[in-house]
Regions:
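Signature of alpha-helical transmembrane segments in polytopic membrane proteins
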Residues: 1-128
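C-terminal terminal-structure detector
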Residues: 2-10, 377-440
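N-terminal hydrophobic signal-anchor/signal peptide
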Residues: 2-31, 122-266
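Hydrophobic alpha-helical transmembrane segments and immediately flanking/interface helices
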Residues: 116-132, 331-337, 346
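Phosphate/oxyanion-binding loops and surfaces in catalytic or ligand/nucleic-acid-binding neighborhoods
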Residues: 212, 284, 309, 372, ...
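Short, glycine-rich, amphipathic interfacial segments at transmembrane boundaries or analogous
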Residues: 223-224, 229-231, 288-329, 386-406
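A short, structured surface patch at a secondary-structure boundary
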Residues: 322-383, 425-433
Length: 440
């Protein structure tokens, strides 16, 4: 389920979705091959009758993988391989739980076989599609390279992601009826600069490209695809007005939040109590720390955390710093491992927060940032979360400049939040828990 806001990359997304769907349908041969292997193994009594039956059941995780890859076709270029890993592995890792709930006997070997074959199939499809279309762009306006550098802050991001950008071959200016002479069949699209001056010749070239069914992208759209951020410096009012959320997915997301939080209760509640006891024994003061934060639709709510600072310092509204002297010895550990966030699962159950979304900010800071950064309030269109796109991409933000960068990630999430993006964030959060990235 994808956001309903209209993206300037809709045509690219549609192309990638079409490619995923076609490749997934061809991949049914993978299931047939797995079934044939299982049948042969059963005939020679090298496997039980459960093997081919399990292969048939594995059409469910195969379909889930296909749907997730289809749903994630709009994700930033640099996240494609990570999401491919998540989308191909997670359904098969969850398969034993599904068999247990259904009380259905199954073959672990069959699950492993179908997973390996389907993962190889979708990986092959990814590299095939990427080699054919994904990385070759031409630009019509000479200002495009400079604009990309301004928006991204580092032109090397193009080369780091193997994105080829070259000028579009155009006819001589004396041609009364100019036509594009470039071989556009090998291009993923043509980039134009909406701020570039226009004339009759440029308009005819653009119309010629459209008649050839060439995809046209604004320079801002390409920057967004590369960086996974909304470009605040070029964000127009109508772009913000289009951020209308994703009501259908909101319901699924809320039910998932409640279900996962309750299912994990036997794990996180004892862990929270143990960490809280360590906080209490380490320094004088309460176990918990609360603060007013701003949530969905700008509503205030009280957030709960395990106290990680000295009690007399904890209520001060200021950004945490590297090696902050207010943080206790136990506080450093629970911050690095994110254990201090566990009480917020109560906020998730209450509906103040979601498991995934922009991090809720202190009310004092929100008032300041909303005054200085006009687009800031739009991050409150969705529920705040325990972890979010800005957290896994940027880490902790301090000061107005880093907050603006954080906002660009948050607005990207608001515009595109979906099951695919939430799965990617969950995967990256799990990795971060082992590294301590972004902890202060």
């Amino acid at each position: 389920m994808k956001s309903h806001s209209h993206s300037p990359l809709d045509s690219s997304t549609a192309h990638r979705q079409s490619a995923v769907l076609g490749w997934a349908l061809k991949g049914i041969l993978v299931l047939l091959l797995s079934y044939a292997i299982g049948w042969v193994l059963e005939q020679y009594q090298w496997a039980t009758y459960q093997f081919p039956q399990t292969v048939l059941w594995c059409s469910v995780p195969y379909a889930i993988t296909s749907y997730w890859l289809y749903n994630g076709a709009y994700l930033p270029q640099f996240e494609e391989r990570r999401f491919l890993l998540v989308a191909t592995a997670a359904p098969y890792l969850a398969a034993p739980l599904g068999f247990a709930l259904l009380q259905q006997p199954y073959s672990r070997g069959a699950v492993l076989l179908v997973y390996l074959l389907s993962a190889a199939w979708f990986t092959l499809g990814h590299w095939r599609e990427r080699g054919r279309y994904a990385l070759s762009l031409a630009y019509l306006d000479s200002s495009v390279p400079m604009r990309l550098k301004e928006l991204l802050g580092d032109a090397s991001e193009l080369s780091q992601q193997d994105i080829k950008l070259r000028p579009l071959a155009i006819p001589a200016a004396s041609d009364a009826a100019p036509k594009v002479t470039d071989d556009t069949s090998a291009l993923a699209g043509v980039v134009i600069d909406p701020q570039a001056p226009t004339d009759a010749v440029r308009e005819r070239l653009i119309s010629d490209l459209r008649l050839q069914h060439v995809r046209l992208y604004s320079v801002e759209a390409v920057a967004e695809l590369i960086s996974g951020r909304k470009m605040l410096s070029n964000l127009q009012a109508q772009d913000l007005w289009a951020l209308d959320g994703n009501p259908a997915y909101d319901t699924v997301k809320r039910l998932t939040d409640i279900g996962l939080t309750l299912a994990a209760l036997p794990l996180w509640l004892p862990l929270c109590l143990a960490a809280g006891l360590a906080v209490k024994l380490n320094t004088p003061g309460p176990m918990l720390f609360s603060q007013i934060r701003i949530g969905r639709n700008g509503r205030e709510f009280r957030i709960w955390k395990l106290r990680s600072m000295r009690h007399e310092e904890a209520t001060t509204a200021r950004f945490a710093q590297p090696n902050d002297d207010r943080v206790t010895s136990v506080g450093k550990i629970i911050r690095r491992t994110r254990l201090d966030e566990l009480p917020q699962l109560w906020n998730v159950l209450k509906g103040d927060m979601s498991l995934i979304g922009p991090r809720p900010e202190q009310a004092e800071f929100v008032r300041v940032f909303a005054h200085r950064i006009p687009a800031y309030p739009y991050r409150h269109l969705v529920r705040p979360g325990l972890t979010g796109w800005a957290q896994v991409q940027q880490g902790y933000a301090e000061g107005e400049e880093q907050t603006a960068v954080k906002l660009s990630y948050d607005l990207y999430y608001v515009a595109h939040y979906s099951l695919a993006l939430d799965l990617l964030i969950a995967y990256k959060t799990a990795r971060i828990l082992f590294t301590g990235f972004g902890a202060r």
